[in-house]
Structures are given as C-alpha cells and as structure tokens.
Amino acid sequence: MKETNKWSVRDVITTVLLSAVLIVIQLVVNMVCMANDFVSMVLSVGITMFLCAPVYMLMVSRIGKRFVTLIYMTILGVIFILMGNWFLLPYYVLVGILCELILWKEGSCQKPKRLTAAWTAASLLYNGVNLLPIWFFWDTYYDFALASGMEQSYIDSYVRYYTSPGWLAFILLFTTLMGFLGCMVGSRLIRRHFKKAGVL
C-alpha cells in the first residue's frame, strides 16, 4: 500500500479498531498470566509482545502513514490512566515518538526491517509498565494495587523480580526477543497471507 501523509476517516477508524485489538490482547494475556506469579512477572510481557507483533505490523502497513504508532501508544496510555496509572500516559507517548522516529523515513511503514526495529524497541520499553512504579511512583502503585485487590504476596513477588539484577536482565532480554520473534511471524503472515488476500 502506498504511503501518503493524508489521513482519511477510514484510516482513523482502522487505527482505533486495531489499537483496541492490541490492547484487548494485552489485557487478556495479563489477566490469564496473573494466575501464576512467575508467569505474570517474568513471562507475560514477552508473551504479549509476541502475540501483538503481527497485529501491529498489519496495522502500520495497512494505514501506511506516520503517527499510527503514536496514536496506538497514546490510546494505551489513556487506558492506563483509567486503571489508575496516570504516569504511564506521558511514558507511552514518548515510546510512541521513538517508534515514529524509527519509521519516519518515507516508505518505512512497508519495510519489515523498520517495523521490526520499531516493535522490538517498543517491546523493550513496554517493561516500563512494571519498572516505573518501582523506580519513581511506588506509593501511587502500592495504593492502586491494594485498592484493586492484589494480594500482598503478589506485590512482594513483583518487587522481588523487578529489583533483582539477574531477573531484571532476563525479563528485558526475553521481552525484547519475543517482540522480535513476533515480528518474524508477522512478516511471514503479511508476505504469505495478507498481501495475497488483498488486505495490503
């Protein structure tokens, strides 16, 4: 699909709908993984980035315009505000801007390598959802966690994993790798299915 700068109503609707799909995937994975502390703390973000990668690549390729990623990240930040984590909105806006810089060159929205670079960076930085509370907003997060019904054992596990250098390094590497692998799957799906079906 040819990349242009002019947005249509259809582009806006498609961006919002696919952003909603991405957010639903993220929320569902998070809820399912909360059944086990290890899976929730260590693996869930990586699983999320892997599953979301093909949808993200489809969305950006389908729209073929700048600011798609920024819009998605902004919507994600608004969802976190509604969940009580106001500090994640400016953070995800910054993540969106970084991804837009990676995709800024004309034609990047149709280049798998550029899309992979953008989503891999987003995957690494998505860990801010767990790191920012510990580093800067612990009181806000702790009050939110208790108010939302989280058990103290869950909060203790969260602190243990995200303050251990070894576990933190593993989580960051795992999440980044899973985002990258998800893009490999997404590139294959786009090449073998979406383009042939006329979606792109």
Q: Language-model features: where?
A:
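Aromatic-anchored segments of alpha-helical transmembrane domains
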Residues: 19-27, 75-83, 122-131
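Interfacial aromatic-anchored transmembrane helix boundaries in multi-pass membrane proteins
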Residues: 30-35, 75-103
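Membrane-embedded alpha-helical hairpins and interfacial helices in multi-pass inner-membrane proteins
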Residues: 41, 117-191
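Short helix-perturbing small/polar motifs within transmembrane alpha-helices
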Residues: 24, 93-131, 183
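Short, charged juxtamembrane terminal tails flanking transmembrane helices
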Residues: 1-4, 190-200
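Membrane-interface helix-boundary motifs at transmembrane edges
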Residues: 3-7, 62-64, 104-114, 193
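Hydrophobic transmembrane alpha-helices
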Residues: 2-71
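Hydrophobic alpha-helical transmembrane segments
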Residues: 12-17, 46-47, 69-74, 89-90, ...
